[in-house]
Amino acid sequence: MKKLLKTAAVAAAAAIALAGCSSGGSSDPSNVSPTGEVKPREISWLLSRPADGAVINIMKKLADDYAKDHPGFSLNLITTPDRPSYIQKLETLAAANKLPELFDTDATPFAQQLAKQGKMVDAEKLLKSLDVYDNYRPSALDYQRFDDGSLRMIPFQFELEFIWYNKALLQKAGVSVPKSLDEIPAMCTALRSAGITPFAIDGQDQWPLERYVAYQPFREAGPDFIQKLKKGEAKFTDPAGKKAVEWLASLGKAKCFQDGFSSQGYSDAQNQFTSGQAAMYNIGTWELPSLATDKLNPAVRNDIDFFTLPTTDGSVTAANEFVSPSGIGMAVNAKTYDPLVSDFLKFALTKYPSEYAATGALSPTTNVETAVPANATPLYKKALEKANDLGDEQAMPWDTQLDPTTNGRLQQELVLLVQGNITPEQFTSTMDSTIAQNAPKFFK
């Protein structure tokens, strides 16, 4: 907890410092076609992605290909996969006005401050100037947009989040796939009675639990609730907020998550599900290679399936509307944007989609077809096809929406709520006051 409080404090300090500094460059964020000679040099990309992941591997290859015709060019990848550490690094560099040519960020309140200060190139104009804008999935771009609709980040992924489940374990407990979110607590109780852990969750990284607090409000009030909540225009005492808090508390009482979940990490959760110890696992299509190929444990392979986020009685969003993120986006530093950066991005963004789709992943664009691996189970194709039937709304992860201090506090309080260490009333009081104190610094 001390580490979390320290991170939140650093983020707040960086925000204050950022608010006091100028844009630091004369570049016009809307000037996406800089004139002049392309002069090869090293450019850097500050990113928060798996070091051995497809995005980095492909961009390394494309950078090497570009360098063949542009001697002296290189792409320096500065990666920090751990998200809290990355955010701290990003905010520190931004406050010091030392951001590299390219940098990763979600569409957070902090990032919107950077955009307002002219530090980020207009990504919509950039993509249109490269004649690739229309290739992108609208939902992939919408995920990257700020509240005002502006686009400053470019997506490199497109994912769908499902609740994966073990059919045999549900059958053993005498339960079926829930039709409503409200059925899940009772479902967990039945699974526990049968000696089965209901959900495997990565509690250590905190964002997986934070997903759950977004679900009831998204069904009850749609995507507008978090837009208002983060600004202090809605509260946890409102019907949608109250329903979220009470539901999270009921998940805790029903022992929906594995014992000691708060200290267990990503691989722990994955192993619990793939070894048949847990009945359900809430994760995205980035895990298809682990869950829908012959890499999956043969003992459970034929029992695995998935369902999408259940609706609720009177839900204002549809069953085909759920969390469909395009991952952390890449911003282009307006201060260092020059003919070289422009030329490299044109080269890379034109070739990237086909390279990415060839890995078996969903591209953020629709002009390429994802290659289904030879070792895939039928579930792989079934999951990919869900991308063709998405509604217009999407559930935004709250960690991309809240100010840094509020988000850090929410993650702490959610663990305490689910563990039964605090009451719903205590949670509500703490969070509403935290938002009231911190939102004005970011949403003026």
Could you tell me what each predicted segment is?
Residues 3-14, 21-112, 117, 129, ...:
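Conserved N-terminal structural module of periplasmic/extracytoplasmic solute-binding proteins
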Residues 190, 231-261:
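Glycine-centered hinge/linker elements that transmit conformational signals in sensory
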